């Protein structure tokens, strides 16, 4: 028998071990070993047992065979990595900066096998005509238990083990004896754990409107001739994007293919999964972080075995092991949750496009408010642009009012509700219609503003709001500029200047005070900690158990409530002035999504946006649901300030206990890349300069070309390894970050 060798990535995340190690495959394992399996090997001088993943098999090695150690065993209770996922992991490692083992664990959403759920049944083996004679024999020999079990089997043909043991009081020895006699046999049936109670009553497909049908006709044509594109579906809120997804998936399933649907938040699960199960029945599966280990493993197994056609879930669902992948849909593609905050800091949108290219699949990116990056790709022809400009069912867009909170203060209204919003809430409560109040807290990080004139303290060098720190100073987290906190507004001289603080609990309390008869539900991180709490809150609101739903951004993501006719955005400025170059984009997206919740049924809707910055283009364009006008303003700003997508950005983040050493290393790293024709900003202190006694600093590197930044990352990694920097410091890389540091 020929020798076989395995290249193995050791399961230790350390840069010094980020390479393959060759091991000999024992003859006894040659038939069983596979690429992707987890194995146990002797590692290091002490030959300590260590796990690793097989990434390649070959007949030869490049060095002395006598020094090559043998694999000890294959880990049968661990899930292996599919071979195509190893290639994807290598791409992630190269493009985002991580070790190979970190990348492998990323593409393996389920790592441990979990015992299958099983039910035992007892089935009759003999023909029923012989049953009475056998019963007589058992009675004559006083085999009472056997007679009782046989009588039940003659009546039912098959009974559960539970019924036999609990109801009939039959022992295992009795069953074993009758099985040996050939009277019956025991059958074990495995079943999947059910992660949630979702409706699976199938419903007929909706009739598509003219715009939707045109898109599906184009998709079908492209798909049948294996022209697999990336489509950007830009549709105004309520335009029926989900119906386009469903119809496209139906086309894919007809061709024997499978589909992955990514959703941005667990809060979308209840309504989204119900819509998909109504269309495709039980062949829909769900993956999310709230599943138990067993539920998660079962859904992974269903996908691997081809028992499902559609899998729905957040970012990690991208890596399910479908064998015939035909389509990946990413709904609300602009959402920040698609970017991993853990190393490797990959973006699901970019990885799914790479995965689709590898597996011959199509991609649909959908949003009412596409990311600036995606829309730029659509305009330059990298993606195919699809647009839905009409609301489905001929529903009209809501009337939007922008309320200037500076004027409210002048009029003596110090309440968190503007006068118009109060009147409209009263009106809806009287009519028995529902209200959603949205607190735009996303990205909130202690910006300082004036309540009299709306002025926000911004960095004079970066055009980004500065953050207030406990030492009484304002800092810019991009360039490090700082200044003392002011006691009066530099624009109007008002003493009403300070940080902006507002929470959902305060809103709930204020509602009960203003409208004691109203029934209020609150949806935020505190009220959604328990499993299925999202679904329970949304279901209760949908069923009319409350008049008002108060929440953070999780309440505005794609939920349809026919009786909601009023949406209030209480403080648009909370995200608008976050110290982040994406603040304007995020504000536009959240306001547009929030406004889109009103008037989705037969009744017209109204939206109130409360702000200290009514003139800002993000607020003006969101009120009109005019994405094109917003994009024109935003891309000009990005180009002027050299932010993505006009320029590419790499963040080098480092932290450590020794501040002097951190400063020295970060200065040295900035010098390493400065001669590479790059724009290097910093090093500067991170937003939180110290956490858990770890000092934190960042360097921002910019260039028009992404590959040039990848080369800069590689150069820095080499320098870090050469100087053994990671012994004392944590260093991470983040391309085009979604959040500020």
Regions found by a protein language model. Name each.
Residues 39, 88-91, 649-650, 654, ...:
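Hydrophobic/aromatic-rich, well-ordered segments within soluble, folded domains that form packed cores
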Residues 671, 675-695, 731-738:
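A carboxyl-terminal module marker
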Residues 2-5, 18, 47, 432, ...:
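A general secondary-structure signal for short beta-strands and their flanking turns/coil
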Residues 56-58, 108, 188-190, 439-441, ...:
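A general secondary-structure junction signal
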Residues 11, 151, 639-644, 686-692:
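Short, flexible, solvent-exposed loop/turn segments with mixed acidic/basic and small polar residues
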């Amino acid at each position: 028998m020929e020798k076989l060798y395995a290249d193995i990535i050791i399961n230790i995340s350390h840069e010094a071990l980020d390479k393959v190690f060759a091991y000999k495959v024992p003859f006894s394992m040659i038939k069983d070993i596979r690429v992707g399996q987890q194995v146990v090997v002797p590692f290091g001088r002490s030959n300590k047992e260590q796990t690793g993943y097989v990434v390649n098999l070959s007949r030869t090695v490049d060095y002395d065979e006598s020094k090559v150690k043998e694999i000890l065993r294959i880990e049968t209770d661990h899930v292996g990595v599919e071979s195509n996922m190893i290639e994807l992991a290598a791409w992630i490692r190269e493009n985002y900066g991580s070790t190979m083992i970190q990348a492998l664990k990323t593409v393996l959403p389920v790592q441990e096998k979990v015992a299958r759920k099983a039910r035992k049944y007892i089935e009759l083996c003999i023909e029923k005509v012989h049953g009475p004679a056998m019963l007589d024999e058992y009675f004559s020999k006083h085999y009472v238990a056997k007679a009782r079990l046989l009588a039940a089997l003659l009546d039912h043909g098959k009974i559960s083990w539970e019924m036999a043991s609990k109801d009939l009081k039959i022992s295992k020895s009795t069953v074993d004896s009758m099985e040996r006699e050939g009277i019956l046999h025991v059958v074990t049936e495995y079943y999947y754990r059910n992660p949630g109670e979702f409706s699976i009553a199938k419903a007929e497909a909706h009739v598509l409107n003219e715009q939707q049908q045109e898109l599906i006709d184009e998709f079908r044509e492209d798909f049948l001739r294996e022209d697999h594109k990336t489509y950007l579906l830009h549709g105004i809120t309520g335009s029926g994007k989900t119906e386009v997804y469903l119809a496209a998936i139906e086309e894919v399933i007809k061709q024997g293919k499978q589909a992955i649907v990514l959703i941005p938040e667990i809060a979308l699960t209840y309504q989204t999964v119900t819509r998909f199960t109504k269309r495709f029945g039980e062949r829909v599966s769900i993956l999310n972080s709230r599943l138990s280990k067993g539920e998660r493993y079962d859904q992974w197994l269903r996908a691997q075995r081809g028992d499902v056609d559609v899998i729905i879930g957040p970012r990690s669902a991208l890596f399910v092991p479908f064998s015939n992948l035909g389509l990946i849909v990413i709904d609300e593609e602009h959402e920040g949750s698609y970017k991993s905050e853990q190393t490797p800091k990959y973006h699901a949108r970019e990885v799914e496009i790479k995965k689709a290219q590898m597996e011959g699949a199509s991609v649909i990116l959908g949003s009412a408010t596409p990311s600036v990056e995606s829309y730029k790709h659509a305009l330059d022809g990298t993606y195919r642009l699809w647009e839905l400009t009409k609301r489905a069912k001929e529903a009209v867009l809501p009337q939007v009012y922008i309320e200037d909170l500076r004027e409210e203060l002048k009029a003596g209204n110090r309440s968190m509700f503007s006068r118009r919003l109060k009147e409209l809430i009263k009106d809806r409560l009287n009519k028995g219609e529902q209200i959603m109040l949205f607190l735009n807290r996303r990205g909130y990080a202690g910006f300082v503003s004036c309540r009299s004139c709306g002025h926000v303290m911004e960095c004079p060098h970066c055009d980004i709001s500065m953050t207030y720190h406990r030492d009484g100073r304002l800092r810019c987290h991009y360039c490090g500029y700082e200044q003392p906190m002011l006691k009066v507004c530099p624009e109007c001289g008002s003493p009403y200047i300070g940080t902006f603080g507002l929470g959902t609990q305060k809103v709930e309390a204020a509602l009960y005070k203003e409208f004691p008869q109203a029934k209020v539900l609150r949806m935020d991180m505190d009220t959604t900690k328990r499993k299925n709490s999202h679904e329970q809150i949304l279901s209760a609101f949908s069923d009319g158990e409350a008049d008002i739903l108060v929440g953070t951004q999780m309440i505005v993501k794609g939920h349809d409530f026919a009786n909601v006719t009023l949406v209030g955005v209480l403080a648009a400025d909370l995200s608008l002035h976050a110290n982040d170059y994406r603040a304007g984009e995020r504000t536009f997206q959240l306001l547009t999504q929030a406004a889109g919740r009103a008037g989705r049924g037969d009744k017209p809707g109204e939206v109130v946006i409360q702000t200290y910055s009514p003139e800002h283009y993000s607020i003006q364009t969101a009120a009109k649901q005019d994405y094109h006008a917003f994009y024109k303003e935003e891309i000009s700003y990005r180009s002027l300030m050299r932010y993505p997508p006009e320029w590419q950005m790499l963040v080098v983040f480092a932290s450590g206990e020794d501040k002097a050493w951190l400063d020295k290393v970060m200065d040295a790293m900035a010098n390493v890349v400065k001669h590479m024709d790059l724009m290097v900003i910093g090093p500067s202190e991170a937003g939180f300069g110290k956490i858990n006694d770890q000092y934190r600093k960042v360097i921002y590197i910019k260039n028009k070309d992404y590959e040039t930044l990848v080369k800069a990352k590689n150069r820095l990694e080499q320098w870090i390894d050469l100087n053994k920097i990671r012994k004392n410091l944590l260093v991470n890389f983040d391309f085009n970050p979604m959040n500020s540091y």
